Amino acid sequence: MTKENKKTGKVLRFFIFIFSLIAIATSTFAIYEIFLLSNIENLIRYIIIGILGLTDLLIVLKLMGKKKKKRKKSYLVFLIFYSIICFCIGGVIFYIYGQLSSINKQSVTYTSDLLVMSSNKANNIKDVKDMKIGILNDKKSPEGYIIPKEIIKENKLEDDNEIVEYEDYTSMLVDMYGEELDGMFVSDHYVSMFSGITGYENIATDTKVIISKDKKMKKAATSKIETASSGKDVTEPFTILLMGIDSTEETLAKNAIANGDTLILITFNPKTLNATMLSIPRDSYVPIACWSGKPENKITHAAAYGNDCMINTIEEYFDTKIDYYAKINFKGLVKLVNAVDGVDVDVPKELCTDDSSRGKQVCIQPGHQHLNGEEALVFARNRKQLANGTFGREQHQQELIMALVNKMKDIKDVTKFMEILNTVSDSLDTNLTTKQILSFYNVGKDIVKRSLSSDDADLVNVQQLFLQGEGQMIYDERAKMVLWDYVPNKSSRKDIIQAMKENLELVNHKNITEFSCSINKPYEKKIIGEGPYNSGFTYTLLPDFTGLTEAQARALASKYGVTVAFTGTGGTVVEQSEPAKRRTDKIRGTINLKLSGSKKDDDDKDKKKKDKDCEKDTDKDKDKEKDNTGGNDNTGGNDNTGGNDNTGGNDNPQPRIDE
């Protein structure tokens, strides 16, 4: 062997040694990443892992073996090729796993603002003196208590100010607008939280922020929901709550509480591929789980107090445990629809709504349309132009979800899947673990199998649910005003609960004993909860007594079963101690009604009447003297009709109580 050949052999052995180590390292990386794909094609995974492991063993034995006189260049090529393959396998899995992990945001940035009225003289934190400031009394609330307490401590606000604890933001806001409170700590999403309430439409200009503070926190530290279902297997029936957030933020890395603009509760049975889908009206009047005493209010207001409050409220009302949730904001929906290259839906009429940034208006035309992201947002958000308002919007949201599912099930390209993940991961948040998300692969696989063996277009049988109810104008105890609420029908709610529990295999199916159809009428799938029902349910609300006479008010009070007491006499009711439209079951004690004919008014009337009677007597006496022919004509007599009229009674009349 020549000197040159020896030198070439040493170089070749060196590269073989280096690439052997690289091959083993990349193979180990690939094996680790493949192990992460638990419960996905287990047999194939184990075969691949076995092949990679065996190859690594041979490479190690090759390195440890006796030196051969001749090293083949083909072996070096194999090592390079093997390293590239292993690196690509591991890299793709690493990327997908990382994107899926980012959907479950372990940490969120919360922001709390110290808010005051624009007319307040304070312009910065140093000006905050001799003020009454409100905070939430919920010690687990990052934006209502935890961060405010830090601001108070850092700026020594307790030294010169009074800190008052409240149960809810709305009561604080009412007191601040009513000048009973100088400032309040609230989430930086306060505009979207309150601008939809009558009287607070201009909250953005009515108020100003004195100081803001951000704090990044682990969600699990403030929420029990985050880890409640971490060990559940998605191969078993489960529930998931989809929440559409009224937020224009690009991502959900920053906490987006705002209003629960869209609430869709889904139960899914992976064994049967049956699902139920319920759109919960945002104005549903239900008990709010995180408020003291659990008073009824609009369900959308629960969103301002975090995921736990919203989820617990829905769980308790529908008597069903929610295993998972998924949140998406406006930007996320736009990105998702664009990522799947648009969706096909039927648009009933021309609809126009602001875009996701609220910068310009976007319109969609009637008919079967292929919509892009911004257009799909119009389809999902618009309600004011629809004949059935909110309920029409809920129907559109369900149709959009099904359109997205139909597009997603046709994706077979890994590159496209990675593109979608990359596009929407920042705008999604969930408590599903990465392992649980990966388990949906098997669900998708079952759907594909069914599609190959069936001509049925509906591969997943979706049973629509509808919460029937009636609208009522009810006095809001916290907002101190009358608001429109949607009062659910109890029978509808009962049927919905039964349907969800049946799909979750928690109760036995109810047998259908009656069925009818007609060849003259096409079959329509029944919507559970829609009714019709023989009876509805509404609350008895206190009437408006103003403008009624005492007798009319007494009769109306008797009709409504309330006790009233009157102050003053005569005239009509000008004031009542309890607001109209308040629920009568919330009223304790007597309702005081003030009549327009008060003591002073009655005395003035008596005085005028006496003066008029005296004038009449004087005129008659003059006529007698002038005539002197009328004798003792006493037909006029002493007109005592004025008399001592004591209808005014005491200066401080006691109320009369009538039932």
Language model features: what each stretch is:
Residues M1-N5:
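Short, Lys/Arg-rich, polar N-terminal cytosolic tail immediately upstream
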Residues I89-S107:
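Hydrophobic alpha-helical transmembrane segments in integral membrane proteins
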Residues I103-N104, Y110, V116-S118, N124-S535:
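Non-catalytic, solvent-exposed segments at the cell envelope interface
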Residues R71-Y95:
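Internal/C-terminal transmembrane anchor helices
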